Amino acid sequence: MGYMPYYYFNQNSSFGSEAELRSLITKFKAAGIGAIADVVINHRNTEGWYTFPAETYKGVTYQMQSTDICKNDDGGTTATQAATDGVSLSQNNDEGTDFGGCRDIDHKSENVQKVIKAYLKYLKDDLGYTGFRYDMVKGFDGSHVADYNDATGVEYSVGEYWDGNDKIESWINRTNKKSAAFDFQFRYNVRDAVNGAANGKVATSSDWSKLNSNDNLMHDANYRRYAVTFVENHDTQYRSADSQNDPLKRDTLAANAYLLAMPGTPCIFQPHWRDYKPELKEMIAARKYAGITNMSNYANKKCQKTLYVNEVTGTKHKLLVAVGNDADKYAGETGYTKILSGYHYAYFLSNDAETSWTDVPSGSYEEGFKTTLTAVSQTEGAKLVYTLDGSTPTAKSTTVESGKEISINGTCTLKVGLLVNGEVRNIATHQYTIEKFNAYKFMIYVNADAVKWSPLYCYTWKKAASVEWPGEKMTETKTIGGKTWYYKEVSIDNATELVNVIFNNGSGTGKPQTVDITGLTSTAYFEIETSKEGKKYKVKDVTAEYNK
């Protein structure tokens, strides 16, 4: 696994064990969530130039050969080496973009197809994945994705074809429209609107009229069902001063508000979810309530530099999404009621929804808060009734005008109903838990016996880098299980924090380092291995062996 995969059927990695992965997928399924596997099959790592691992699964041994490597791999460098070594490559050239540093594999090869189909069936039928995210599909013909999807019977797939809109549409066609694709141009539309300028530049103010673009999959009724829309991902996010990439420079919530109101299949960036979970949950709830799908139609209502408004028609109701510096001044359209608002965004639900709306979602919170109750109704003057003890509200329960705030001071079950002409309708239930987060500390242990790095450094970060490379020199050790373990104490200071770490041999060109180890929240044990993923050393997570 990983971006330069060597093994297909071994799912133990620096992220955790195969057993932990299976447990996670099972828990997702129980919650009605399908897991999508990141499938990297354009290229594959080798031992030396040509040797792929032999892997036995269910009594069958699968192994790619040197003749499965594209003839012109690495711009012909591999062929030159093969001629020197007397090794044969495939007679077929690469079907797409060449990837340097790994062997580009020939998807026309029957052996390659056999191995990959077995691998994908293992992911779906054995591990339990629901779908696939095909990485770097510019490297091989889209017809193979159709073949692989047919062979595995996978429920869903999306391809990463990072290019212009016409080429993405052509790739979708090559898959016989059996796969979705990431809508990169949608992302660039949003970036340019937020930044106020194109190509990653930043103007003094945003220009939300730049959202009015036909250069995306989402605008086209024939392709929007295949569009996986997003506003940020791992390749565009800011990582460090040395790896700034192409992030949104402001208005993250407004960008997501637009994303979640529009057709296509929206994909939320995980760091955004962690940072803005309550707000994003409410946006998702509004999308679902209106019945907005990947095929919904929309019409523009306002297209100005400081205000952009679309009306989106769902299968149940309509939703107005307003974004821009003047979104707070926008009063909506006749027949709509504002249900959500924040910095530079607002949602309005059509009054035929006939429902109450609460602008703070169910969940756990560290302290009490206020939530606004809104009556969405075609009846003027409709009010709301509510209870905080889980009982069903009646016309005699506590009554409030639409748009009023109520206080949630402790754990409770809030039930809210729409009160129209003395009748209580469409009662909604919200579960709130108020529990203060207690900061805590935990240990990160590492064993470097296999690589014998001296000195050994530990570079840690949370949301952003807070220390300079190479981090803190590790000097303290413990003997556990007959092995010497270096260790470092770290802290979690709030409920959304994660700790990330890289072990390394110090600063300087050519100094070795491990792969990134991300998302730690509790004591963990890692062994640095001699094998590499690209130029970085792999680590083995052995936490389960020691945290007993």
Predicted regions and their residues:
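A short, solvent-exposed beta-strand micro-motif common in secreted/extracellular proteins
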Residues: 373, 496-507
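Glycan-binding loop/region signatures in secreted carbohydrate-active enzymes
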Residues: 49-114, 177-196, 227-233, 238, ...
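Active-site-proximal helices and loops of the catalytic beta/alpha 8
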Residues: 3-4, 9, 25, 33, ...
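Acidic/aromatic-lined carbohydrate-recognition and catalytic surfaces
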Residues: 1-99, 105, 138-159, 503
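Short proline/glycine-enriched turn/loop motifs at strand-loop junctions of beta-rich domains
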Residues: 263, 324-328, 375-383, 450-456, ...
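Aromatic-rich carbohydrate-binding modules that target alpha-glucans
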Residues: 392-402, 450-494, 506-516
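Short, compositionally stereotyped local motifs that mark structural "simplifiers"
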Residues: 352-438
